[in-house]
């Protein structure tokens, strides 16, 4: 059977998947545990031995995956570039978490910088001590029948964006997550899994 030259089922606008948009787990957690696309992130979080914790709502801007590369152009005698070897490669994620829940605060600012008392007050210390590495997972619906899961086994927050507090925008926390190579994924920084739900259901 000939391949379709055009297939609209592969086209869509990414939106958060029902059952949880994003979760976090301690560094060293085996990411292959969370590849079963029949399960939502909520399903994983409800398991008796669950290590995943929800990061709650994400802003309407969604999740941005960035790729940065550097190359070193090598020229011949006349100045013409003949080879351009890559000298560095990195990937990152930019996202705004909207909830001021403990999981978000501790992920962005570090466990030692977030404390809660028995009177309902949470204190968040702002300092140069960033949090360590975590496993991050993001779930999205990318078409009528397809869902995408992005798994980052070794994500380190390296930046915290400005906080906006005004009467028009939702307040949130916007970290930059640097995705480091992972032995779990044979040196890959992240992997994305795209599943056709009609196939999975079958």
Tell where the protein language model's regions lie, with residue ranges:
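A general secondary-structure signal for short beta-strands and their flanking turns/coil
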Residues: 15-17, 88-92, 131-133, 145, ...
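Polar/acidic, low-complexity leader/linker segments enriched in S/T/G and N/D
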Residues: 1-55
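Beta-strand-rich interaction surfaces with strong enrichment in secreted/lumenal proteins
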Residues: 80-83, 138-140, 163-165
């Amino acid at each position: 059977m000939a391949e379709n030259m055009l297939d609209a089922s592969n086209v869509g606008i990414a939106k958060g998947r029902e059952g949880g948009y994003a979760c976090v787990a301690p560094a060293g957690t085996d990411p292959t545990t969370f590849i079963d696309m029949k399960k939502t992130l909520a399903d994983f979080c409800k398991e008796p031995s669950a290590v995943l914790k929800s990061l709650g709502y994400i802003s309407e801007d969604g999740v941005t995956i960035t790729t940065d590369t550097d190359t070193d152009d090598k020229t011949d005698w006349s100045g013409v570039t003949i080879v351009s070897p890559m000298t560095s490669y990195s990937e990152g994620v930019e996202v705004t978490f909207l909830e001021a829940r403990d999981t978000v605060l501790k992920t962005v600012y570090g466990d030692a910088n977030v404390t809660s008392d028995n009177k309902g007050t949470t204190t968040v210390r702002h300092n140069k001590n960033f949090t360590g590495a975590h496993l991050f997972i993001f779930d999205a619906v990318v078409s009528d029948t397809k869902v995408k899961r992005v798994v980052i086994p070794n994500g380190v927050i390296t930046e915290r964006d400005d906080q906006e507090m005004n009467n028009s925008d939702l307040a949130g926390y916007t970290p930059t997550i640097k995705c480091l190579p992972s032995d779990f994924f044979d040196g890959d920084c992240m992997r994305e899994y795209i599943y056709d739900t009609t196939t999975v259901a079958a």
